[in-house]
């Protein structure tokens, strides 16, 4: 089975040109031409160009990487890390929301509850999952899952990847703000350890609703903010084209957020981003999740809850 065609971001043009040249030379080599040495030299140049490019990414470029269509999504992490996964559907009040996936399974032999936003990877799946923007029933499903996990003493893992909660009229009529607030409260009130990983976009209350965890991890090129750069640009300058300027001002990168104490750990991505080696990224994430839960193991419910609340109170005091 052939690999999917690689998708390049605008700022990756120099790397795209080198990769294209490599493909041309490999085709010639396959026809009998002895140009292996030349191919090796250009491959070395391409690796160097990629390393230099990704060592100096701007916040706006990181935003583009976080949204890359080939970046591993929630379903990929579940498939790579969770065995015996059994999804649960519906909020028992209105209906099912496929933007938010949740269920129970095993992580390295131990029971776990997994909740995550799924953006989809094709036109069909993006529409099915509403581009990862959950409606009220999605957040109420998350509350239902967290309540079950708490009752049975099962740790909770959140995989965060959303531009934000869905802002449609129907969602607002069904109590979007209340659903987000209750989900956030459920996260904070858990007596079992919970770990959140921002794997792509962490947008606004839609992300926070499942990310108020004992440990918050974030991929190197993910973003986490109260509003998207495009929306901030429209509000601040009445000009949606100034998204790049907004991103550069908003402190949305993992590096900024670690410095502010909003997150606990940055997970390094493969050179060129998680989309260049999804399997390696998923393995790295799995190791970090295991270490985070190991650190929280053995704590009683009161301590787990108190530490989590203190963590977020400290963020408020520090940045408020």
Swiss-Prot record:
Disulfide-bond pairs as recorded: none
Top enzyme class: transferase
Any one cellular-component term (Gene Ontology): acetyl-CoA carboxylase complex
Intracellular or extracellular location(s): Cytoplasm
Enzyme Commission (EC) number: 2.1.3.15
UniProt signal peptide: none
Pathway: Lipid metabolism; malonyl-CoA biosynthesis; malonyl-CoA from acetyl-CoA: step 1/1
Pfam families: ACCA
Alphabetical UniProt keywords: ATP-binding, Cytoplasm, Fatty acid biosynthesis, Fatty acid metabolism, Lipid biosynthesis, Lipid metabolism, Nucleotide-binding, Transferase
Any one GO BP annotation for this protein: malonyl-CoA biosynthetic process
Residue span(s) of domain CoA carboxyltransferase C-terminal: 42-295
GO molecular function, one term: carboxyl- or carbamoyltransferase activity
Domain of life (superkingdom): Bacteria
Reactions performed catalytically: N(6)-carboxybiotinyl-L-lysyl-[protein] + acetyl-CoA = N(6)-biotinyl-L-lysyl-[protein] + malonyl-CoA
PANTHER family: ACETYL-COENZYME A CARBOXYLASE CARBOXYL TRANSFERASE SUBUNIT ALPHA (PTHR42853), ACETYL-COENZYME A CARBOXYLASE CARBOXYL TRANSFERASE SUBUNIT ALPHA, CHLOROPLASTIC (PTHR42853:SF3)
NCBIfam families (alphabetical): accA, AccA_sub, PRK05724.1
Subunit (UniProt): Acetyl-CoA carboxylase is a heterohexamer composed of biotin carboxyl carrier protein (AccB), biotin carboxylase (AccC) and two subunits each of ACCase subunit alpha (AccA) and ACCase subunit beta (AccD).
Family listed: Belongs to the AccA family.
UniProt cross-references to HAMAP family, sorted A to Z: AcetylCoA_CT_alpha (MF_00823)
Protein task: Component of the acetyl coenzyme A carboxylase (ACC) complex. First, biotin carboxylase catalyzes the carboxylation of biotin on its carrier protein (BCCP) and then the CO(2) group is transferred by the carboxyltransferase to acetyl-CoA to form malonyl-CoA.
Name this polypeptide is given: Acetyl-coenzyme A carboxylase carboxyl transferase subunit alpha
Origin species: Rhodopseudomonas palustris (strain HaA2)
Gene: accA
């Amino acid at each position: 089975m052939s690999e999917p065609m690689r998708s390049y971001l605008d700022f990756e043009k120099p790397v795209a040109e080198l990769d294209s040249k490599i493909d041309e030379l490999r085709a010639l080599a396959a026809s009998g031409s002895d140009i292996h040495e030349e191919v090796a030299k250009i491959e070395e140049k391409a690796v160097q160009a990629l390393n230099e490019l990704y060592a100096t990414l701007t916040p706006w470029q990181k935003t583009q990487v976080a949204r890359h269509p080939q970046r591993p999504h929630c379903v990929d992490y579940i498939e790579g890390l969770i065995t015996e996964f059994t999804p649960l559907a519906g909020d028992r009040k209105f209906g099912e929301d496929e933007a938010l996936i949740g269920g129970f399974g095993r992580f390295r032999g131990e029971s776990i509850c997994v909740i995550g936003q799924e953006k989809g990877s094709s036109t069909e799946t993006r529409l099915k999952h509403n581009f990862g923007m959950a409606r009220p029933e999605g957040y109420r499903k998350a509350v239902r899952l967290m309540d079950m996990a708490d009752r049975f003493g099962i740790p909770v893992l959140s995989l965060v990847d959303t531009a934000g909660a869905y802002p449609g009229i129907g969602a607002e009529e069904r109590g979007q703000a209340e659903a987000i607030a209750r989900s956030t409260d459920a996260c904070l009130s858990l007596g079992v350890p919970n770990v959140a990983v921002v794997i792509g976009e962490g947008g606004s209350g839609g992300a926070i609703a499942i990310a108020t965890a004992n440990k918050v991890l974030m991929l190197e090129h993910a973003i986490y903010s109260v509003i998207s750069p495009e929306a901030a640009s429209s509000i601040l300058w009445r000009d949606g084209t100034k998204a790049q300027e907004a991103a550069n001002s908003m402190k949305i990168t993992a590096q900024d957020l670690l410095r502010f104490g909003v997150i606990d750990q940055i997970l390094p991505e493969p050179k060129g981003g998680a989309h260049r080696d999804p399997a390696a990224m998923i393995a790295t994430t799995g190791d970090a999740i295991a270490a985070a839960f190991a650190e929280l193991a053995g704590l009683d419910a009161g301590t787990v809850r108190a530490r989590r609340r203190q963590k977020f109170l400290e963020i408020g005091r520090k940045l408020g």
